[in-house]
């Protein structure tokens, strides 16, 4: 009897490509999701046993191996669609009760479970190993820690995707007709039967309905524009069709460490001590070896790891306490992990971390030096960085072509110089077709013409792998180029690297040659093996004249390289100002093009802090100013995170961006600036109207964040950020509240925020106020003093003072936020009733948007949702919130109900003790509680003799 009804494959499961995949882009690329719609059976000619048919979200439908021929083409991403649920198990991150789909249980922590979405979104400690439960009844499968593993972006029919009717559509013209598109607004379960199995879609005509995406194995939709559904770790997903018990045995047999592996323990002492119990035990001397590199000596029978640190010292460790250090050598191709927080944690003492390293995350590089302590110097693009080996993963050799194209360009140029040296060293006495390339290199036009007359069919002959046209184009021998073209040289002939003559002209900075080649039909948009156009080559070399020539000849400036970067992406990175100006003026440039990291050109400019690019892009595409990446980050978020203050000013003042825009974690730019301790940016954002009381996903305000990170930002305020830090510190010191207390960055920012109106009693989702996060009583009092100062200033200020002292709330056109406090007391339209009236001023948000009558019942500002603490009229008197007739009626009704309740209570309460209820009734009709009645002979109310006691139940 099968104890687990979900243990086998079922239609409806959601899958991604697996380890044995060999079917190219049938799934539309790695990371795309499909649905199992048919299970193979014995005797079927098209879908035999141990195969399944998958309907991919983007339309393809094909069968795949799930054990057939011993191969497994697919991985199971989600089985919530077939009803898998873990009753009474709560995800300790998102708090959802009854985890749907696979369950992930931490091996290090007591009773800690995650759902698939939280597990794949890097919740909890990445250095902890987990167990995977495919169903509520299956045996657990141990998986390695997520640390250092590559995450793959999940793509398909998810929230935000554009869809049309799909293969199982049976809903008539609900979509508005064949070919009409809709947008997915939500992925949900079908009642209590299944999870994440249907999609709510809003069609172009405005109607919204729910459609199957795996429910009962049906797929009603086809994705035309994919959306991101999160991430997944390929190594941690089960192979579809492989029995869980075999996968469990595989995970047990495949120990994460082998003899000779280089390892480190990177855990805190307290965590390590706790983990060591039952795994070799704890010895205080082990603390000395935390962070040191050791070598795996052997694996014990229990699976623990014996590590040798020097010739004499060996310790036994819990396997989950160790991190394997990849062994790399000069020339190895590596990938930098894409988790910024993990990299920041590993880099101290190993090259350190700088915000300029952020673009390397997830990118591929080459090891150019190995240091004695194991750290690596890695070339990524046109820069090199020192990395902790724990921040790198090995990269497959067959994918080396995806190395940053700028490195390829440099290598190509150096190779060309070598080729030229070889050509020029060859003898030219003999008269043969092979000499054509040599005479072209020597710029001997007469000899080239003579050879072409003798050997007209040899015009494309190669020497050292290059044609005469390619060499002449590189060197700028214009006359030779024209002669070769007149002799019908193949203008788009490629060399071994895929470069054409136009690529060679770009490499050689030959603008005139490029114009001649284009006039003769050279393909300006042809890609070489590194996925680079001639324009990209010219930009990467900084050759302004060639870039200008190619742009004038209408080449496509939007073509990306293998990393999705366009020529303008690279120009921004290299800060080639003239090239940036040229490219941004091209009429058909698309500023919305995203690279593989999801950065459009405005995002990328903000990330790099390129002021010129920001100004140029905003001048032509200001509508992008609040555009978001997949993670919800806007250009202002990126500028705030990376401390690009001048860029932030441009975005706010010239771009008129929304300073309170939130990312997917509900963080505003102000939150990010505080997280990084960027004092100057904090002051800028607050002065430009950032909401100091805005919540993030945890309910934390800016002040919560500043005080939560005060220990991490231990640098004294006056030593931080030069003049900006000193300026803020001086302002705070001038208040007289600080005394001799030394402020670090976090507490100084908190004081500043309190002075600017931040609510010091605001409770987050854990019920903690900012003051609850402070252990130093002196700091608590200082922050209270600054907060009190703000309140006193607001109360004492008159109408004109209020108007003058308001922070400028930055707004965007065509929204109701253009309403502002007028310095002249003239009637203004109320946002609620539309009557002309003198508007009421709200505190602390400073908005004036409604009249006195409409303001009386408001508890929160309808514009910013901040709780109103005070409402002032134009004459600075406070609005009296007198009760309306409706509230008076409600109060009267409440009083009447209270009177009735008291009367009912009196009827059933014992008249003697007035505590207990009447449970015994006498023949006269009165009564008492049982305890009081025992001593009674006459009724205490009517004085009649008690002859009978009747028990009642109230």
From Swiss-Prot:
Pathway: Protein modification; protein ubiquitination. Gene3D superfamilies: 3.30.60.90, Ankyrin repeat-containing domain (1.25.40.20), SH3 Domains (2.30.30.40), Zinc/RING finger domain, C3HC4 (zinc finger) (3.30.40.10). Residues 1-80, 149-227 form the MIB/HERC2 domain. SUPFAM superfamilies: Ankyrin repeat, Mib/herc2 domain-like, RING/U-box. It catalyses: S-ubiquitinyl-[E2 ubiquitin-conjugating enzyme]-L-cysteine + [acceptor protein]-L-lysine = [E2 ubiquitin-conjugating enzyme]-L-cysteine + N(6)-ubiquitinyl-[acceptor protein]-L-lysine. Its EC number is 2.3.2.27. Zn(2+) 2 binds at residues 106, 109, 124, 128. It comes from the Eukaryota. Keywords: ANK repeat, Cytoplasm, Metal-binding, Notch signaling pathway, Repeat, Transferase, Ubl conjugation pathway, Zinc, Zinc-finger. InterPro entries: Ankyrin_rpt, Ankyrin_rpt-contain_sf, MIB1/2_ZZ, Mib_Herc2, Mib_Herc2_sf, SH3_15, Znf_RING, Znf_RING/FYVE/PHD. ANK repeats lie at residues 464-493, 497-526, 530-559, 563-591, 597-626, 631-661, 665-694, 698-726, 766-795. One of its GO terms (biological process) is protein ubiquitination. It is an enzyme of class 2 (transferase). Its main location: cytoplasm. PANTHER family: E3 UBIQUITIN-PROTEIN LIGASE MIB2, E3 UBIQUITIN-PROTEIN LIGASE MIB2-RELATED. This is E3 ubiquitin-protein ligase MIB2.
